[in-house]
Amino acid sequence: MPDEKLPQYNEVWNDLEKGCLHSCPSYSVNNHVNNPIVKQNSTLTQPSLRKKNTMAAPARLRKRSENVRLTQARYAIFHIFLPFILTLLLYHNFYNYFDQALADLNSVVKYVIETIVLIFTYVMTVIIVYFSFSLIKLAFEEAYVYAPSVAKANEGLAKHVAKTIAGLVKYVAKAIQGLAHIILSLLLFILGLEVIEQDEETGDVEMSSMRGQAITTEPASDNTMAEGTDCNTSKDVESGSS
């Protein structure tokens, strides 16, 4: 029966009498759910009738990791491996086909071109190494995620063993990441040494060329001095004879 003291209950009661609880435009779902009288019997508050995600957690993680691997593989093929192969071909053919052309250029231009090619090659090598270690780290992280789900929940010992293995795998992944950073630092250090050594070689070549020019000019000055002394001696001889 409708009650004048409960207008919200009267609204729901009228909707029930009309037989259009979920179809009447005047019905408010929020009012129905928040109503304490019908809250216990409401189908909207029952967890079993709510929309659930039918995909399990490991399946979602597996699908997400597969998408990540696919994206990284595409990025590696089109942005890393192909440019790296082209760089290696360029670096291999650089001294075979362009050595004679560079010999005719200035030493500074030759040094700049060789430095650019060397830096580009090392940068691509660093990217390859970092990407490889990132894939290894991703594999270990996936093992860390899936290791506890391998063991069943009711098997206590197997579950603890799986968690222990997962923890070890996590630390191994961190160690691999640190090793990748160490290798990157070593590669950059080697790159710096190569550039310094190349700079020293060009400096030695310039110094040797300057020394060669000095050596070639010194005998000419000696000859002129000798000629000058000969002239003076001849003049002295002529004056003495006279």
Curated annotation (Swiss-Prot):
It is found in: Cytoplasm; Membrane. Keywords: Cytoplasm, Membrane, Transmembrane, Transmembrane helix. The keyword Membrane applies. It is a multi-pass membrane protein. Its main location: cytoplasm. Residues 204-242 are annotated as: Disordered. This is Uncharacterized membrane protein C18H10.18c.
